[in-house]
């Protein structure tokens, strides 16, 4: 799930 990363880091820290 690529959305998992955006969901956890909506700020784009990762």
From Swiss-Prot:
CC annotations in GO: extracellular region
Record-stated family: Belongs to the tachykinin family.
Tissue expression notes: Expressed by the venom gland.
Keywords recorded for this protein, A-Z: Amidation, Pyrrolidone carboxylic acid, Secreted
Subcellular location, principal: secreted
Name under which the protein is recorded: Tachykinin-like peptide-XV
Protein's UniProt keywords contain Secreted: yes
KW rRNA processing (keyword) present: no
Compartments, as annotated in UniProt: Secreted
Pyrrolidone carboxylic acid sites (modified residues): 1
Modified residues (Valine amide): 14
Organism: Phoneutria nigriventer
């Amino acid at each position: 799930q690529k959305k998992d990363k955006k969901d956890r880091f909506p700020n784009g820290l990762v």
